[in-house]
Amino acid sequence: MHPNYYLSPLAVAIALGIASPVKAADPIPLQKSSFSEVTQKFQLTLPGVMKGAVVSTNSLQFIRQHTDGNKVTHVRMQQQYAGFPVFGGYAILHSKNATPSLATAKSDEKMNGVIYDGLQAELGQPKPSFVKNASMALQQFKDKYANKQVSEDQVTPMIYIDEKHQAHWAYKVSVLVIHDDRIPERPTAIIDAETNKPFVQWDDVKTEKVQAKGMGFGGNRKIGEYQFGKDLPLLEITRDSSVEMCFMENTDVKVVDMGHKYYSNNKPMQFTCKETPDTQSTKTYYTGYSADGYDRDNGAASPTNDALYAGYVIKHMYHDWYGVEALTKSDGSPMQLVMRVHYGQGYENAYWDGKQMTFGDGDTMMYPLVSLGVGGHEVSHGFTEQHSGLEYFGQSGGMNESFSDMAAQAAEYYSVGKNSWQIGPEIMKEDSGYDALRYMDKPSRDGMSIDVADDYYGGLDVHYSSGVYNHLFYILANQPNWNLRMAFDVMVKANMDYWTPYSTFDEGGCGMLSAAKDLGYNLDDIKKSLSEVTINYQSCYVD
């Protein structure tokens, strides 16, 4: 396939010259220049002037115009030298004439922008090989992505003006690269025609890909249906205008549709979102494969919508309350939360595997497990792993599991200002025989969990030993002058700074006291709460 590039008639006519750089280009700030001065040095192609009529080496080519409410017409132009576009050379004419032209433009017309003089002396004319080598420059650029799916390759011969105002013959090259696991990118570079080294390079898909808003529905038959954009905030999604596709992804969260399979390339769920008069101004689009706001499954309105919202809330909760990322990469930079939904067949669970969160769609006992609480729970396993590293067995395992339950309640509290003190009530089906997975106010209500440390025994499942710290959290948050946020403050601080991988219940209590002291919270209230769940703090040293 031949590359796409544009040459003006003038460029073709003089492309057989010889280049002879001499000196730097001279920038002309147009706010300080008169219209007559500009027209003496540059040929303007205002509306009504045919492109083929351009005979000057230096020209300002018409791009577009519009007239504002003050009846001033603003005409945008790009500088060309020898028929090739000049990097950074743009002029805007501001005319009170409704149809500005060279004949009607006045000498005192206002302009702004920057154009460059002296290019003739610095560049001379392009070498015969300048245009011919454009295809070669593009191919070398494409070779960097030889193992990727590449399309829409483009090359434009041009003049590049560097930061020192030196002018260079150059090529602007770009390709569209399709990835299996993330949004497409458009690598773009301006390359030196002599050395093939880039002057600048960037991902140009950012000019087409915009943060957009998603409308849609969530919930399930038990809790009812709610609407994002009405009952809850609009969803933060991403849109690629070049292909009119939306992606269930933003800088914080990516939602992957597993399609009821067990393996995935982690490509974000995507759907067609065409521009309409209604969406053009609001940048708001209905989510779902049919763009109706749904991707129904097992009684739930849209697991993808709920997953995106849950991830967004959880990440922002940690950031807003504690100034930290929910999860980070090995170099300490923020980690995008990957929420995988529609996992497997009849899978009634959710998990964190060290890299991502995965949610089943439930079966006979549960609706899809993508509630805010379950999402907060799974993400917070990652938070614990990256901070205290509480091992997932014994008493430390119970603390690990409990911290995630606490985070589930905190996410609800952060989102709507209240919480249920139950884990998973929103996903349990009405005929399952259970109204929740666990209860923080009285953990033993589930028939398996323990309420106090004295009831712990070796080998107890961590989901049941979590009852001790779940109960502790409930008691502390309900002390006079306390609330859920304050209680979670203590637990987060302890997890980050005091707990260790093999902490026992008692050692965890000491960490809580140290954390509370750091925060300036009442230690006696903590001691009282610890006593109620038979955690011994007598050996704790808090200076």
Curated annotation (Swiss-Prot):
This is Zinc metalloproteinase. Residues 25-207 form a propeptide. GO terms for cellular component: extracellular region. CDD domains: M4_TLP. The keyword Protease applies. Keywords: Hydrolase, Metal-binding, Metalloprotease, Protease, Secreted, Signal, Zinc, Zymogen. Disulfide bonds: none annotated. It comes from Legionella pneumophila. GO terms for biological process: proteolysis. Zn(2+) binds at H377, H381, E401. Its cofactor is Zn(2+). Gene3D superfamilies: 3.10.170.10, 3.10.450.40, 3.10.450.490, Neutral Protease Domain 2. The active site is at E378, H463 (proton donor). Residues 1-24 form the signal peptide. Binds 1 zinc ion. One of its GO terms (molecular function) is metal ion binding. InterPro entries: FTP_domain, Peptidase_M4, Peptidase_M4/M1_CTD_sf, Peptidase_M4_C_domain, Peptidase_M4_domain, Zinc_Metalloprotease_M4. Pfam families: FTP, Peptidase_M4, Peptidase_M4_C. It is found in: Secreted. Its main location: secreted. Its EC number is 3.4.24.-.
